[in-house]
């Protein structure tokens, strides 16, 4: 039995007409011999509307109640999707996370999937039904509803594909993964194949096509992912194991993330245990710290800077100010006007001079670097937000413009 997990994003299911378009794509997969399992996001704007509604009731709603509320968005979408398939003559059954079941840990609003029961899905498929599963949500061992965080429907889809030993098709409002955001770089190029490792870096660095945990799942369980447009029949981008990617280019893509906030703890006593105290408290609050910079010690004191996602900034500020007071630091300075620019490519493992070229390009454009972080296949620089788009365009021109193995945004090769 050849199963295909097909995930549809919020824009794809944003209207009843679009849901019918998505349903017809599912039927095409069925006609090609696949047994489809559908995963749907909430309709576009639905989650934001529910968040606004909650905040009218409570400025900081309890996370358990937020999960219960937000799960409604996907429940509405899957019911409409299943109704549409049934109307078109194809039996379908909608399933919430708890009905599958998708078992998660107990962390509300950012839950992680622990295991998935597939027996009910397989039974429905054998009986001739198309299962339509709610993305973004799960249930704890104690039957508490949880959500997986923004973009969690991608994670649901890839996790289901892993459990069912299937390929995964991500249907979205873009035609694939590009070398840069086409809204910033009009001649950005669609990537035909990209490795898990490269996609993981791009997702973690701000690329919005895939959610980071979904790529982690794919890499761990070897799930091949096809990212494509719901509104086009053209081939998208395949996310695959490294050995399937023929060309190991130095730079595969460039990302910008303006959803970062930088904190600087000024005049921190430079002694053992201080950094641990700050970052352990942030970790205990489930706040992910990204870039960290510590200045050279002067007269027994130092400055320590780090970045977090803007969604966690208020909570992080509250925590760090308390610790700063406790350890005798002078003050905590917050900067919301920063951006993280990154270049990613598996060929960077064996290429030389890439960092120097990147820093030179930024310098020639008058862009100052506030922090740097690197891995084997990426280099990230923190800069002022006002220079973000200029930096992306300049780096794209330097590293990618002349690469002929990519497809241009309009689908034509450079041959």
From Swiss-Prot:
Belongs to the aspartokinase family. Transmembrane segments: none annotated. Keywords: Amino-acid biosynthesis, ATP-binding, Diaminopimelate biosynthesis, Kinase, Lysine biosynthesis, Nucleotide-binding, Repeat, Transferase. It holds the Pfam family ACT_9. GO terms for molecular function: aspartate kinase activity; ATP binding. GO terms for biological process: diaminopimelate biosynthetic process; homoserine biosynthetic process; lysine biosynthetic process via diaminopimelate; threonine biosynthetic process. Its EC number is 2.7.2.4. Pathway: Amino-acid biosynthesis; L-lysine biosynthesis via DAP pathway; (S)-tetrahydrodipicolinate from L-aspartate: step 1/4; Amino-acid biosynthesis; L-methionine biosynthesis via de novo pathway; L-homoserine from L-aspartate: step 1/3; Amino-acid biosynthesis; L-threonine biosynthesis; L-threonine from L-aspartate: step 1/5. It comes from Aquifex aeolicus (strain VF5). It catalyses: L-aspartate + ATP = 4-phospho-L-aspartate + ADP. This is Aspartokinase. PROSITE patterns: ACT, ASPARTOKINASE. It comes from the Bacteria. PANTHER family: ASPARTATE KINASE, ASPARTOKINASE. Coiled coil: none annotated. It is an enzyme of class 2 (transferase). One of its GO terms (cellular component) is cytosol. Residues 263-337, 343-415 form the ACT domain.
